[in-house]
Each structure stands twice: as C-alpha cells, then as structure tokens.
C-alpha cells in the first residue's frame, strides 16, 4: 500500500498482527494451567490406588484426565489454526483485510474433524498417567491387575522379589529415592545419578548411554527423563511393609 510501511515486525501491509500474536502468547501460557491440572489429577488417582479407595473415585480422576487431554488437544488445534492463518495472510499480503476470525474457525474445525481417541497416545502426560496407574496397581498387588496379567495365584514373595530388582539404580547400585524413567528405552535411574552422568558426558562432548546392562540406547538426554511417581510410591510402600515386619 502506498504510504504504508510493511517492514515493521508483526504487520503485513496495513494488517497488524501484534495484538493477535500477543493474545496467542497469553493463550499458550494457559498450557501450564492444563499441565498443572493433569499433574494434580494424576497424583490424586495414584493416592486413591495406593489407599485402595473405591473404584468409582479412581474412575472420576481417570475421567478428569481425559477431559484435560481433550482440552489440551483443543488448545493445540486453536493455536495451530491461528498461527497457520497468520502465516498464510503474511505470505499472500492481500490488499483487502480478510475475516481472520472466520479463517481461524475454518482451520480449527478442520483440525477438530480429524479427532480420534488415538490422539491421546500423543499426550505425554496422559500416557504417563495410564502407565503409572497400571504399574502402581501391579505393585500394590490389586486383584484385578493380577487376573489381567495372568499372575493370579503367583506367590507374592516372588512378585516382591522381582519388583525389588527394579528398585535398584543401575548407576549407584542402591535403592532409588527419586526414580526417573527414560521415555525412550523405559529404564529407570536415580535422578541425581543419571543427571550427573549426562552432564559429565556432555562436558566431554560425548553422548550418554543407558547404564542398564543390555540396553542399546546410546543417547540419553535430560528431556527424555520423566518422574516415575508410581515406582517411587512402590518403593516407599515396600519399605513401610519391610519396616513393619521387622518390628
């Protein structure tokens, strides 16, 4: 447009996106609220399993996690729709101001139309929640999980002995207090030990390999590590039982 500068950041011709981009940034911050809600629901669900509270209460937390995961998907789709619209308009540089709201809504609905339950497998916190819930039930020896895993009637001492192997850090060779799981290979380590190992290797410009014997994963990164809340609780419960038996 004559007399208009298009060199300013966040604008295309006479169309300014600064306000939209600012609002988009604030919208992204809402992601932290969703993550916090998922962490709380996950923690409560694990508490319910640990205390063997009625299944209906646990189901409520599971339902809450589904709702959070759904909200997370909607937020990601909306952010993607806005960003896609902005990029498209910047590239096209139209003389006439388009209906941005309508364009965003069309892109958002197009993304939403492809929704499926399989999408939840891409939500890291939701997947982690389901895995830890299953693991904690197994560690607590709940009947339903024994039947599902085909371990009904198996000696509990054998199960405990097998579980204790998972309690030991492959680096320190000691029982873990703050276990973290590697998302890539699934092995667990003491948090401080594996972080020190990764940092030490990085200082020498080398990759950190998984210290678990037999594991072929040779590039562990801090971003691959997640808190293994189920294992931490299982270790604590095991120690409490051991302490009671020794009294």
Swiss-Prot record:
Main location: nucleus
GO biological process, one term: telomere maintenance via recombination
Post-translational modification: Sumoylated, possibly via autosumoylation.
Entry-annotated residues carrying N-acetylmethionine: 1
Annotated crosslink Glycyl lysine isopeptide (Lys-Gly) (interchain with G-Cter in SUMO2) location: 90, 107, 125, 130
One Gene Ontology cellular component annotation held by this UniProt entry: Smc5-Smc6 complex
ZnF endpoints (SP-RING-type): 154-240
Keywords associated with the record: Acetylation, Cell cycle, Cell division, Chromosome, DNA damage, DNA recombination, DNA repair, Dwarfism, Intellectual disability, Isopeptide bond, Metal-binding, Mitosis, Nucleus, Phosphoprotein, Telomere, Transferase, Ubl conjugation, Ubl conjugation pathway, Zinc, Zinc-finger
Localization, UniProt: Nucleus; Chromosome, Telomere; Nucleus, PML body
Gene Ontology MF terms in the entry: SUMO ligase activity; SUMO transferase activity; zinc ion binding
Leading EC class: transferase
InterPro entries the record matches: Nse2(Mms21), Znf_MIZ, Znf_RING/FYVE/PHD
Pathway noted in the entry: Protein modification; protein sumoylation
EC identifiers of the protein: 2.3.2.-
Residues annotated to bind Zn(2+): 185, 187, 210, 215
Residues that bear Phosphoserine: 116
Domain of life (superkingdom): Eukaryota
Role this protein plays: E3 SUMO-protein ligase component of the SMC5-SMC6 complex, a complex involved in DNA double-strand break repair by homologous recombination. Is not be required for the stability of the complex. The complex may promote sister chromatid homologous recombination by recruiting the SMC1-SMC3 cohesin complex to double-strand breaks.
Disorder this protein is connected to according to its UniProt record: Seckel syndrome 10: A form of Seckel syndrome, a rare autosomal recessive disorder characterized by proportionate dwarfism of prenatal onset associated with low birth weight, growth retardation, severe microcephaly with a bird-headed like appearance, and intellectual disability.
Subunit structure comment from the entry: Component of the SMC5-SMC6 complex which consists at least of SMC5, SMC6, NSMCE2, NSMCE1, NSMCE4A or EID3 and NSMCE3.
Family: Belongs to the NSE2 family.
Name of this protein: E3 SUMO-protein ligase NSE2
Organism per entry: Homo sapiens (Human)
Classification lineage: Eukaryota, Metazoa, Chordata, Craniata, Vertebrata
Name of the gene encoding the protein in the UniProt record: NSMCE2
């Amino acid at each position: 447009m004559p007399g208009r500068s298009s060199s300013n950041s966040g604008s295309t011709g006479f169309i300014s996106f600064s306000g939209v981009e600012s609002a988009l940034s604030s919208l992204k911050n809402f992601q932290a609220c969703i993550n916090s809600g998922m962490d709380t629901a996950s923690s409560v669900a694990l508490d319910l399993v640990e205390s063997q509270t009625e299944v209906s209460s646990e189901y409520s937390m599971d339902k809450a996690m589904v709702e959070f995961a759904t909200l997370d998907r909607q937020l990601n789709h909306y952010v993607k729709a806005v960003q896609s619209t902005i990029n498209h308009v910047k590239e096209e540089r139209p003389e006439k101001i388009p209906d941005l709201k309508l364009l965003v809504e069309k892109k958002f609905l197009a993304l939403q139309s492809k929704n499926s339950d399989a999408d939840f497998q891409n939500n890291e916190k939701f997947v982690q929640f389901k895995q830890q819930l299953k693991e904690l039930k197994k560690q607590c020896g709940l009947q339903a999980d024994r039947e599902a895993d085909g371990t009904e009637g198996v000696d509990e001492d054998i199960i405990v002995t097998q579980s204790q192997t998972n309690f030991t850090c492959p680096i320190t060779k000691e029982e873990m207090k703050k276990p973290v799981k590697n998302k890539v290979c699934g092995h667990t380590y003491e948090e401080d030990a594996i972080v020190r190992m990764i940092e030490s290797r990085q200082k020498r410009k080398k990759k950190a390999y998984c210290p678990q014997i037999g594991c072929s994963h040779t590039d562990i990164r801090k971003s691959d590590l997640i808190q293994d809340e189920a294992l931490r609780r299982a270790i604590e419960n095991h120690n409490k039982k051991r302490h009671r038996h020794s009294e």
